[in-house]
Structures are given as C-alpha cells and as structure tokens.
C-alpha cells in the first residue's frame, strides 16, 4: 500500500513538472523578442550631446513599434523629456508621442495627463505647437470620450493668447477638430459650449497675423464638415475678410461664404447704405462673383469653381454675370425711357448733338455703390477673358454646371462658350467643347455660331476634332443651310484628315437622325439627282460619298417621304452599306422592297424579366449536376452552355452575365471530362493520349479562370473565391497528370510542396469566405492538411485524385453588374495590299487606333503585341497619355507602334493585337498577415500573364535592304 501511495505521489509530481516546463518554454519564446523601450533607453543614455540624442530618436522613428510596446516607449520618452534641456530634442520627442498615440490597438488616454502637464511648463513656442498637435492626435483617437474632448478644448482656449502664431494656429485647429457638436442634448452647458466654440473661433477672424486668420476660417469649415451648423452671424464677419491683404485669407473666406449661403439660402440680408433687402444666397453670389476679379489667380480659380455649385441663385442675378454693360459708371442702370424723361424734365441746355450731354452731374461715391450689381456684373465675362488658363477652365466648368440647371441661362451663355472655341490653350478649347456637349439638349445653334464651331475642325489636334464630332452628334441646328454647312465642313475635314473617317461617319449618322426635315430638301442636291436626266453613278469606295449616304439614310428612317427621291443606284448602295456598315445605316422601309431587318428578329423584343428569369432557371437546373450520371451531367452542361451563349447574343444587356456563367460551366465541363474513370483505371503508360487530354483540360481551365477574373468588370470578392477555387482544382489535376507521367519520386516532392503552399495561401487570403465552401475540394483539403503535410508524394496524389472526384459543384453567385472587356482595332484596318516599306535595321511608325469597352485601369493593363512571321513577338506598353476617356466604361487608345526587322525577300504580314495584362496577386484581398510579411513591392506591378481580347489585324510590311 505504501509503495502504491509513493507511486501516485511521484506521478502527480511528474505532471506538475511538465506544466512548469511548458510555462518556462512560453516565457522563453516571449523573451526572444527585444524590448523596444529598453533599447531606446539604452540609446538615449549613451547620447553625450543633444545632437546624438536627436540622431537616436530619428533612427527610432524609422522602426515600427507594436501596440503592446507603445506604453513602455512612451514612458521612456517622457522620462527623457523632463531631463532634456535642448528644445530640438524635446520637439522630436513631442512629435514621436503624437505618432505613437496613433498606433493601432493602443489607447492614448494613459499619456494625456502627462502631455497636458508638460504643456503647462513648456516655454518653447515650437515645442508648444508640437505638443498641441500631439493632443489633437490623442483627441482624434478618442472621439467617444466627451470628458477628454472638453478637457482638450479648455487647454486649447487657454493657449489662444500665446504670442506665437504657430501655437494659436494649432489651438484653432484643435478647436475645429474637437469642439463639441450641437446634438439633441438636455444639458444647457453642452449647447453653450458648442456656441462658445464658434464665438471663440470667430473672434480670431480679426487676428493681426494672416496665418491665424486663415487657421480660424479653416477651423470653422472643419466644424461644418463635422456636422455642426454654423451661425448666420458668421456671414458678415466672412464678408469683411474678402478685402483682406493676404490671398490665403481671401481664399478661405470665399469658401466660408459659400458654405453659409448653402446653409441659409433664403435668409434675408440688408443691402449696405440702402433700404432694400436681398436673399442671402444672391448676396453671397454677388460677393463671390466680385472675387473673380481678385488680384490672385488662386482666389479667382476658387471663386469661379464655387459659382458653378450655386444653383439656388435668382435668374436675374445669374444673367448679370454675362453682361459687362449692365452697370453704367457703377450706378444702377435705368431704361432708355427713364433717362430721356429725366433729361427733358431737367431743361438743361446742350451745345452738342445730344440733349443734356454736357450737363453737370453729381460726383459718384464709390463706397456707396451697390455691391450686388457691381459684383455679379460680367463675372463670367471676366473669368472667360482671364490671363490665366486655369481661371478660364474653372469659369467654363462653372458655366456648364449653371447652364445644366437653367435652360434660359444656357441660351444666353452660348455665345461666350462658342467664343472659347478659339482659345489659345488646347485644354481650354477641349473643355469648352465638352461643356457645350453637356448642355446641347437645351440649346439650338444659329448659323453664325455654327460657323464658329465648324472652324475648329481645322485644328491640328485629333482630340479637339473628335470632341467636336461628338458635339455635333448631339447639337440642334436651326436651318437647312446650317446642315449643309456642317456637311461641307465635315467633308473638308475628311479630305484633310482621312484618319477621322469613322468619327465623321458616326457624327453624320446622328446629325441626320436628329434633323430629318432639314435634310429632306437637300437630298436632290446631295445625291445629284435630276428629274429628267440620269446622272452618273458615284464611286462606292469614296469615303465622302459614303458620308453623304450615311447622313441621308439616317434621316430617311423617320422621314417616310424621303426614299421616293432615291435613284436605283442609291437603293443598290443602300443594300451594300446595310451589310457592310450596319452600325451606321439603319433598316429602312423602301418602296417595293421588304423591310431589311437586323440580325435580331423583329418579333423578339428585349424584356429584362423573362430573360433574367431564363438565366436564373438555367443556372439553378445545372447546379443539380452532381446528382446525375457522368454522361447526363456532360449533356446538361453542354446544352446549358449553348443556351447561355445564345442568350448573350440576343440580349446585349445580359451578355456579360451570360458569358461569365457559360465560361464557369465550361470549366466544370472540362473538369468532369478529365476526371472520367476510364482515364484513371489503367496504368498511365497505356493511356498517354488520355493523359494529354487531361493536361490540356487543366491548362484550358487555368486560362478560362484568368479570363473570368480579369476580363470582366464588376467581379466581386465572392466570385473571385469561386474562380480561385476552380483554378486550384485545375492545378491539382495538373499535378496528378504530371505525377502519372513522371518517373521517380524526387521531382514530385517539390511539386507537392508548392501545391500545398498554394492551398495554405488560399486559406489565408479567403479565410472569411471558407464557411461558404462547405464540402468543396478545398474544404476537404484543409481537413486533411496535417495528413498531407506528413505524407509521401504518392499518397498525396491519391488523396487529391479521390477528393477531386468527390468534391461538389460550387454555386457561382452572379454580380449585379458585370461586363466583358472588349477591344476593336480601327487602325490599321488590315485591308491594304500595299506593303509598308522601310529600310531594314531602321524603324517605321505604325499608327494604332482602338476602342476599349469595360476595361479596368487600361493605362496599366492594356498592351499592344506585334507578331512577326518568324515567330518573334514584341510587346509594347502604351503611354498613359495615349488613352482617352470619351465616356463611362469606354476608352480610346491612340498610339504609335515602332516596327523593325532585318531585310526580307518579299513582303509578309505581321499581326497586331491588344493584350490584357494581369497579376493575380493584385486582386487578392489584403489580410493582416500579408501586411506584416516581407513581400517585394514589385509583385504588385509585375505582369503574370496576358489575355488576347481583340481580333488580330494583319499588316503588310516590307523591310528593304539598306543601300550601299
């Protein structure tokens, strides 16, 4: 019995010792991490001079500090702060305290008392300002702690009387960021505190230092951004600052006046030295208009930009901005009848041609002039004639915004916008054209205005010309002479710049469809028809003749009497153009002929609900594929893929979703075919052909998943997870095929290890989405991960093969809006049989013009590939300036590709195509573990692969041997 008790005692003692060993091991693991505070303390103690201490602090600032080490580091810094006499070192310590208080996971309320205490005893103004900045960082980190906010506001108020402008600036900044907001509170103290903050800040509008005045205005604007409603009394204070000597103050005051005018637009304010009253928004509009003539171009730009957002202004004040002569000698202008009546009633004698023209008049008191009229008068005229092009651009943008909200103002500002088409700066001309296009629905061009607009077609800039073509597409013309003038000028443009052909044809298409009644009387002249004589048939290869036909045919679509004027050859030309240029020539009901329909039958009308319902039903039906036998599953997938592809052809609005779903089902079909039992039941050497089939299927699945991930815009994270999961299955299939055809075990170790690393990487990147992947391939892999890590390659391959067959078909959630990226190469057309000749060894420039649809970040992803007959491939990276953005989801690529090669004996064709570069690492969501890992910054910008997304164009070239 005693021996048994002794044995039990030893057993219990042994268990206790094991627990102690675990604790000791844990402590050792923690102690391996060096202490930041201890290292900093040792460095500061080693410093023999303030310069050394400052150097150590600068080195420490470059190293990251963990949240659990921040408090110890702060204590060391504060301890050294009290000992330090040099202000530069104290300044750096104060800066470090502010940086450390922003550390994620650290609550800075424990250092606030120390920061306030050292603030009370500090004498250096620079250190004071830095300490206030630290307190601002602490207060911003603790927004819910009202007591802390109030305490910091009190500290800021006490130091507002400091003689240094930097300290006062920081105090005002702290008040603007931490001042209490007005809410539904019951205590009067909180409401009064909010009002006091505004009053305290407003008192510093008249500070002697302009930097403090600017900081006070910005603090008031910060209160507004945080949700505090500013008082109307601030308006008068801000108006006085418009005449300040410093541009920073005037610029901030303009912004504050705009804010108050948006808060109290309908409030009534008196006009100085007058019995009249006016709406506050009108008064503010006049004052901001006055600042368009400010001496500083920065203030003028800001004033012009703010004018565009003041849509509540009265129409008569708005119209004053376009008339310089509204004020006569800074007086209110009276009508001619009133002036004549006053002259005759005065009885003044005149020796000149005009009655009373030399009569004495009272001296004008410029200080008593009504500021509203003198401010708003001609503001936009001054802005559009400014010497700085930035001001002119801002004025044009403001005109656009106001004209969009007021059709009457749009008509009145039309002349001024048309005049801006002749500006010396290309950017201003381009902005003016874009502005007119935005307001084109509210205006109709007169002939003189149209003449000025069409003169821009001679501009050497392609961007200007194409922007003008876009403008003419949506412009209303008043007369048939205007249509004829536009056609003549566009044909001149076509002759001078043949590369504008497609843009001009598109312009004439919309010009004809918008003005059918104006085109009708011009048809006999344009087609050169005669009532009695047959005229010669024009050349169908002439781009100018095609342009005329495009104009006429689009006008005939809504004008049923026009086809009767067509001759026989015109009808033949219509049939030809309807086939070759169907996107420019509409379907017409011609006499004696059937309606030429489009590719979509007329009885099919796009209804979103039935098509969407059919799409959903097809996908729901196919997700039951795992319950069918392999042959039935393959047939169901094939039929569904065919239906989805046809649906995408018929319904353009569902093309992206249908193609996306069909591609995913195609990947699943390839996987099912590759996993058929007959391929794997016999030894691999007897089925090399089937192994090649499985390897090709894995490769194709990889390519299709990259297309799904990077060729479609609107793909969300939940779709990326499913796509990456499918790619992981393809990699597993590739590993299985490689293992069956590889001799020896050694090469498999590296491949299996790499695959398991990819599985682990997938888990870490998409850990939040793993619950949605139950019973999937990766879910079963993760369950067996410890076993896989310890298994031999042969066992790993067997497990992968079993899990691939048993994995379920994952449901792919469809995004709300998804579009497939596409590109069309316009130039080179690839139709010419004349080779492009150049000397071998030198280069020749090939112009490339392409339209891009639904491409994300084209500046970094779109590449141009040139494939030579000998197999050489050249990839060109277009410059960011080569891309244009004509509309949402659309881009235009205009670039030059330089070709070079050795001498050839005869001309051959090179292929030009557009590629979409991708990097799968850039789409992976950022995880905390990834941020801490040491990853190369080049991974984000490197190119992992490319996807062709345009049809190749073949160009004849002929490198000639150099002459000797």
Curated annotation (Swiss-Prot):
- GO cellular component terms attached to this protein's record: cytoplasm; INTAC complex; integrator complex; nucleolus; nucleus
Xref: InterPro entries = ARM-like, ARM-type_fold, INTS4_8HBD
According to the record, the segments passing through the membrane are none
Position of the Glycyl lysine isopeptide (Lys-Gly) (interchain with G-Cter in SUMO1) cross-link: 792
GO BP terms: namely: RNA polymerase II transcription initiation surveillance; snRNA processing
Position(s) of the covalent cross-link Glycyl lysine isopeptide (Lys-Gly) (interchain with G-Cter in SUMO2)? Answer: 792
Give any Pfam family that matches: HEAT_2
Q: Which GO terms describe its molecular function?
A: protein-macromolecule adaptor activity
The main location class comes to nucleus
The alphabetical list of record keywords is: Acetylation, Cytoplasm, Isopeptide bond, Nucleus, Repeat, Ubl conjugation
Could you give the subunit structure recorded for this chain? Answer: Component of the Integrator complex, composed of core subunits INTS1, INTS2, INTS3, INTS4, INTS5, INTS6, INTS7, INTS8, INTS9/RC74, INTS10, INTS11/CPSF3L, INTS12, INTS13, INTS14 and INTS15. The core complex associates with protein phosphatase 2A subunits PPP2CA and PPP2R1A, to form the Integrator-PP2A (INTAC) complex. INTS4 is part of the RNA endonuclease subcomplex, composed of INTS4, INTS9, INTS11 and inositol hexakisphosphate (InsP6). Interacts with BRAT1; interaction is required for the assembly of the RNA endonuclease subcomplex.
Q: Can you say what this protein is called?
A: Integrator complex subunit 4
- Organism annotation: Mus musculus (Mouse)
């Amino acid at each position: 019995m005693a021996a048994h008790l002794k044995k039990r005692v030893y057993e219990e003692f042994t268990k206790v010792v094991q627990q102690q060993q675990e604790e000791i091991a844990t402590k050792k693991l923690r102690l391996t991490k060096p202490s930041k505070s201890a290292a900093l303390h040792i460095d500061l103690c080693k410093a023999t001079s303030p310069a050394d201490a400052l150097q150590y602090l600068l080195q420490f600032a470059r190293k990251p500090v963990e949240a659990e080490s921040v408090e110890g580091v702060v204590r060391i810094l504060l301890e050294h702060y009290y000992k330090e006499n040099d202000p530069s070192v104290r300044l750096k310590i104060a800066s470090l305290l502010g940086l450390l208080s922003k550390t994620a996971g650290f609550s800075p309320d424990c250092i606030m008392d120390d920061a306030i205490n050292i603030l009370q005893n500090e004498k250096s103004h620079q250190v004071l300002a830095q300490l206030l900045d630290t307190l601002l960082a602490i207060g911003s980190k603790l927004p819910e702690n009202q007591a802390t906010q109030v305490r910091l506001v009190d500290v800021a108020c006490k130091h507002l009387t400091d003689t240094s402008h930097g300290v006062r600036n920081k105090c005002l900044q702290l008040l603007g960021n931490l001042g209490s907001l007005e809410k539904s509170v019951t205590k009067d103290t909180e409401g009064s505190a909010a009002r006091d903050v505004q009053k305290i800040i407003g008192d510093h509008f008249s500070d002697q230092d302009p930097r403090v005045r600017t900081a006070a205005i910005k603090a008031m604007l910060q209160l507004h951004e945080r949700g505090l409603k500013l008082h109307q009394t601030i308006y008068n204070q801000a108006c006085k600052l418009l005449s300040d000597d410093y541009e920073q103050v005037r610029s901030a005051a303009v912004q504050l006046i705009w804010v108050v005018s948006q808060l109290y637009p309908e409030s009534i304010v008196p006009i100085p030295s007058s019995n009249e009253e006016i709406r506050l928004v009108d008064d503010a509009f006049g004052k901001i208009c006055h600042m368009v003539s400010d001496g500083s171009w920065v203030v003028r730009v800001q004033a012009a930009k703010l004018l565009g957002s003041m849509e509540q202004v009265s129409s008569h004040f708005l119209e004053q901005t376009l008339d310089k002569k509204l004020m006569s000698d800074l007086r209110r202008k009276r009508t001619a009848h009133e002036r004549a009546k006053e002259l005759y009633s005065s009885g003044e004698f005149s020796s000149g041609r005009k009655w009373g023209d030399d009569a004495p008049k009272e001296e004008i008191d410029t200080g008593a002039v009504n500021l509203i009229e003198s401010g708003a008068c001609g503001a936009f005229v001054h802005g559009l004639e400014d010497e700085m092009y930035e001001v002119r651009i801002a004025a044009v943008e403001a005109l656009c915004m106001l004209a969009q909200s007021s059709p009457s103002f749009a008509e009145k500002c039309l002349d001024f916008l048309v005049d801006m088409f002749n500006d010396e700066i290309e950017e201003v001309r381009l902005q003016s054209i874009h502005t007119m296009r935005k307001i084109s629905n509210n205006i109709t061009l007169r002939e003189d205005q149209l003449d000025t607009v069409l003169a821009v077609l001679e501009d050497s800039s392609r961007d200007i010309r194409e922007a003008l073509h876009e403008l003419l597409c949506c412009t209303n013309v008043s007369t048939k002479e205007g249509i004829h003038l536009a056609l003549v000028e566009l044909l001149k443009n076509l002759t001078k710049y043949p590369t504008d052909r497609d843009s001009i044809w598109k312009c004439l298409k919309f010009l004809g469809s918008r003005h059918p009644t104006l085109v009708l009387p011009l048809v006999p002249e344009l087609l050169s028809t005669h009532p009695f004589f047959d005229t010669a048939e024009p050349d169908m290869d002439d781009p100018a003749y095609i342009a005329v036909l495009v104009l006429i045919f689009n006008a005939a679509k809504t004008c049923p009497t026009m086809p009767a004027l067509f001759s026989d050859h015109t009808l033949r030309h219509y049939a030809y153009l309807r086939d070759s240029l169907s996107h420019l020539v509409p379907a017409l009901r011609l006499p004696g002929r059937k309606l030429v329909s489009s590719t979509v039958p007329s009885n099919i009308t796009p209804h979103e609900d039935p098509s969407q319902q059919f799409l959903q039903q097809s996908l729901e039906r196919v997700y039951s594929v795992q319950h069918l036998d392999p042959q039935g599953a393959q047939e169901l997938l094939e039929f569904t893929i065919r239906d989805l592809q046809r649906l995408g052809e018929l319904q353009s609005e569902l093309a992206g979703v249908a193609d996306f779903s069909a591609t995913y089902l195609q990947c699943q079909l390839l996987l099912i075919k590759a996993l058929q039992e007959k391929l794997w039941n016999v030894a691999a050497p007897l089925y090399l052909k089937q192994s090649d089939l499985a390897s090709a299927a894995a490769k194709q699945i990889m390519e299709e998943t990259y297309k799904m991930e990077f060729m479609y815009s609107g793909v969300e994270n939940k779709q990326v997870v499913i796509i990456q999961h499918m790619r992981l299955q393809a990699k597993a299939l590739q590993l299985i095929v490689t293992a069956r055809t590889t001799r020896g075990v050694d090469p498999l170790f590296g491949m299996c290890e790499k695959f398991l690393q990819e599985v682990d990487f997938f888990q870490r990147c998409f850990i939040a989405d793993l619950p949605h992947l139950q019973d999937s391939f990766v879910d079963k892999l993760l369950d067996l991960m410890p076993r896989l890590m310890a298994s031999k390659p042969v066992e790993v391959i067997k497990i992968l093969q079993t899990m691939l067959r048993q994995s379920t078909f994952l449901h792919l959630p469809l995004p709300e809006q998804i579009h497939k990226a596409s590109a069309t190469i316009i130039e080179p057309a690839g139709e010419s049989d004349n080779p492009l000749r150049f000397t071998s060894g030198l280069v020749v420039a090939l112009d490339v013009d392409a339209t891009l649809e639904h491409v994300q970040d084209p500046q970094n992803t779109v590449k141009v590939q040139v494939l030579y007959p000998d197999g050489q491939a050249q990839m060109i990276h277009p410059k960011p300036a080569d891309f244009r953005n004509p509309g949402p989801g659309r881009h235009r690529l205009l670039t030059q590709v330089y070709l070079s090669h050795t001498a050839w004996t005869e001309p051959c064709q090179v292929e030009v195509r557009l590629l979409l570069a991708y990097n799968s690492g850039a789409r992976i969501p950022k995880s905390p573990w990834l941020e801490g890992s040491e990853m190369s910054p080049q991974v984000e910008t490197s190119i992992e692969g490319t996807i062709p997304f345009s049809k190749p164009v073949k160009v004849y070239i002929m490198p000639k041997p150099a002459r000797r």
